[in-house]
Amino acid sequence: MLRLDEVGRHYGDHQVLHDISLTVPDGQLLCVVGPSGCGKSTLLRTIGGLLPGYEGTITLDGTPVRGVPDDLAVVFQDYARSLYPWLTVRENVVLPLRRRDLPRAERRAEADRILARVGLTDAARRHPWQLSGGMQQRVAIARALVCRPSLLLMDEPFGSLDAQTREDLEDLLLEVHRTDGATIVFVTHDIDESVYLGDRVVVLSPGPGAEIVLDLPVELPGPRDQITTRGLTEFVALRSEVGRAVRNR
């Protein structure tokens, strides 16, 4: 379980986050939305131990977060810069496993397993620069999942992709979440995406000193799909509620 108690952050005299308190149960997919520049990414990096020096407390399974937890993985929006262009797709995915005492053949088998999950078996020997943007982001997701993290942080991972590729990866994420059950904190500026993906949506207020202004459970029938789910009356109502909170109306 991930827990935040009265978490805040300052940069000098500038307050970015104020009194953020959350409890995220194991296996929940939590979406965080808010106006541009309100501190969503700062919150995500603080949760992941990437930005030390915060106020309040953050615990993961009861252990205070004072650095990057071992069972954490992060997927960023800028997939092209997060992959090593001189390594093959398989070598990029294997990279996190090198910290573990596993035989080389087992590391390769794990990488191939997750590449199959994300539909990239045929691309294993290619290099990232030979792939489309959507395929590169699939590689980044595969690399994050290969160590079977208990907490996955995703910072607007689909924000720079075209609409069709974005929908494909949203559905891939839902499938992975159903089968793997990791706790996911997903930052997005897209209101529709937050409602489509999330078990719960949290809305941050505009800065400075962003606070939680809405904490909304998302109860939609499953399995979700792009056509049926987005056409549901419940979906439209939830989207409107989140939209009003984001726009402070």
Residue spans of the language-model regions?
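Conserved ABC ATPase signature
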Residues: 127-131, 135
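Helix-to-loop junction immediately C-terminal to a conserved catalytic motif
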Residues: 48
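Short coil-to-helix segment of the ABC ATPase nucleotide-binding domain corresponding to the Q-loop/switch region
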Residues: 86-95
